[in-house]
Structures are given as C-alpha cells and as structure tokens.
Amino acid sequence: MNSKQRQVRRLTRRNALKILGSAIGLPVSILGVRNFASSPMLVQWHGEALGAEASLSLWHPNPRVARQAVIMIGSELRRLESIFSLYQTDSEILRLNKEGKLSLPSREFVEVLDVSTKIYNVSDRAFDPTIQPLWDLYSKHFSAERSNNATLETERIVAACKLVSFAEVEVGSQAINFSRKGMALSLNGIAQGYITDYITDLLRNEGFDNAMVEMGETRALGAAPDGQPFIVNLMNPIQPSLIDRSVSLTNEALSVSGGYGMLFSERGAHHIFDPLTGNSANRLLDVSVIAPSAVIADGLSTAIYVAGEQAAKNIIGSYPSARATLTRVDGSTIQL
C-alpha cells in the first residue's frame, strides 16, 4: 500500500472558545429568552466529552422536552465514550491499541476512520490519527520529575515516529487491524467533532430548531432564537487572556487548533504533533475552520495547523464549503 495514500476498504484548545448567545453579545447563560416572539425557554447542560469541557444550550417552548433531551443525550455520550475514549479501559479504541486489532467495530468507529482517511490523503499525511505513540512519549517524558525543560532525545522521537503511519491501518466493517506492533490511535483530533455532529443531528431529529452544541467542538443548530447568528469569541493565540476575535455561526460548525491548548514544557512542546518529524507543529499559531459539519472542521483545523500555510490552500480546497483563518507566527492572519 502506498505510504502516502490509504484506500477506504486538551487543558484543551477548546478553552479558546467562548460561546455567546446572539449578535448582541449576551452570554448564553443570561439570554433573555422571553423577549423572543415564540417565547422559547433555555435549558443548559455542562459536563465533559472525551476529556474536554462540554455544554448544551437548548431552546424549546416546553422546558420539560429540553430536559428530557438532555437525559437522552447523556446516555448517548456515555455510549460514544465507550467507543472513542482513551480513558475508559474497555473502550473500543483502547482495545484496538492494546491488541492491535478489533473485531466487529462499531459503525461510528468506522465512520470516523473513513473521514480520517480522506483528510489524511488530502493533507499529505499532516493529519494522522496514529500519533498516539508520540503523545505517550511526550506525556511520560515531560510528566517525569524535573523534566519540564529537559530535551527529549531525537532517537526516542525517531523510534516513536516509526509507529506513526495511518496508511498501515486496515479499516473494514468486520475488523480494524494495525500492520505493526506498537501502533496506536488517538482520535482526539476528530472524534470530538463527530460527537458534536451526532448530538446536533439527534437534537434536530427531536424537533429542536435552535441549539448550541459544544462537545469539544462547536456547532450551531439553526440561529439564536431572535433570528441572529450565534457569536463565538476566540482568544488571542499570543495573549490567551485576551478575547479579540469573533465568528458568526448559523447551521455551521467551528473548530480551532493551536499548540497553546496544552503545553508540555515552557520551551513550547505541545500536543499537536507533526507526524513526519515527531516534533510539535510550529508553522502557525492557530487555525480556525468553519464548515457545515464539526467532524470536517475538526479534522481540517488539525491538518492545516500541522501542514502550514503553503499546504493549506490545497487542503481547504478539497472541501469547498469550508473556510479557514490562519494565524501566522508573527501574529498576522490570512483567510482561505
């Protein structure tokens, strides 16, 4: 199989987002929902999904219906975490990582890997879900006592990189297999987007017209109840304490990728790796992508952040409905 093509057959960066209720800039938590003509009521939920902060803001004339939806969503989140979580010892992904194979994978697992395959290919391997060996290496090294600024030996990075190759993952409806012992998946760069879409679609099927879904990625169902877009404010990647950018969302999703989301060391080692070098990606400060679905926005923001500006146009061009904003290392921005 060609090493560059596969055939189908976070502390996290999410803290960079602050969801606001409508174009007037009122936080969701204090929206005056009774001011809207249809008098929808706001019901909110806050929790976690795959280790990231998660929240729902639902508007419905009958708050009991919204609360029942939240209960249903909680059950679905637990089921999805049993597939994708790296923290549940019996999850599908951990069983695959431990054994190198997984029989009868869930439909959701296969769907995420199929989306990953396309982004892996169009990004020329910049997006590679098999980077878990690098995560394990960095995490163990920098969590050791007095190693915050200790240099990670090149030989260890090179050894871990030899286990990174999504082209060597065989994906099928009956089984998923690694071709090499020691390989491991991390779907944190795309599964949260998939879950965000899943919950959004569930709400739409339950009759909701207005919702903001944050399951590690952000997706707007419809607009705010007053008909205005939802506004999402983003932090400044150079000074994370500042919020100086905003985007409007109506029936769209947003993902932001940046190394500031989780730093391993004061020297800049972080959680988004270049699978070709094994080092933390450093071509850009951050990337925000808006797309019709959160799973695409999630994968593309990671891919472009790793690949850099020169490759970004080709990557985003493969998804005509998506658009991206790149923040260069000098702080300037470019929109694609």
Name what the model sees in each region.
Residues 1-336:
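Mature catalytic core of soluble alpha/beta enzymes
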